[in-house]
Swiss-Prot record:
GO terms for cellular component: large ribosomal subunit. The lineage of its organism: Bacteria, Pseudomonadati, Pseudomonadota, Alphaproteobacteria, Rickettsiales. The gene is rplA. This is Large ribosomal subunit protein uL1. It comes from the Bacteria. It comes from Wolbachia pipientis wMel. Keywords: Repressor, Ribonucleoprotein, Ribosomal protein, RNA-binding, rRNA-binding, Translation regulation, tRNA-binding. Binds directly to 23S rRNA. The L1 stalk is quite mobile in the ribosome, and is involved in E site tRNA release. Protein L1 is also a translational repressor protein, it controls the translation of the L11 operon by binding to its mRNA. Coiled coil: none annotated. Belongs to the universal ribosomal protein uL1 family. InterPro entries: Ribosom_uL1_bac-type, Ribosomal_uL1, Ribosomal_uL1-like, Ribosomal_uL1/biogenesis, Ribosomal_uL1_3-a/b-sand.
Amino acid sequence: MNTYNDNPKQCLKKIVESASAKFNESVDIAVNLGVDSRKSEEQVRGTVVLPKGIGKNIKVAVFAQDKHLLEAEKAGADIAGGEDLVEEIKKGRKLDVDWCITTPDFMAKITPIAKVLGVKGLMPNPKFGTVTSNIAEAIKTIKSGQVKFGTDKNGVIHGKLGNIKFDIDDLLENLKAFLKVIKDNKPISAKGIYFKGVFLNSTMGKAYKIGKVEDII
């Protein structure tokens, strides 16, 4: 493992320059936090809008009715439907999307497919802004580059900052935004060092550890 203390831009440059796979590798991040994920109050979860996007079209499905359904279609939802869509999913229809959105008044109607959506991490959640009456704004925000994040059982957050075709400065901007939101979501009960380690790598490449996070953001 190579370390470039306090120089994330140099890390990103090395990652992009050394990528050798025959496909467009993603640039990944792993953030090791000083939290105890076994405690619910120390689980760090949320969303962040990466200012330079993630390098792919983010697909959104909307469950709604009446005016909200029309709003979803107009705002560019990849899939939009009401109870008919719920029935199709109950019968086995696959949803090839990254996010699902619904309205507060329709939330109860997707209960029959909650398990199906939940397994894929697609269940609408007010904390993620995906249970809302402002469908158009939610679609716009998500498609601009919104991603979910959360600590695993070891207190590590994994995410993607883009891909090796991104400009280095764009990757750096996404990195800063990602780390800032994690910093802002620090649990009150977390003691000691919060950012224990931040590592960057491409899909097939080796990991680079960056230095002191507080100096970056």
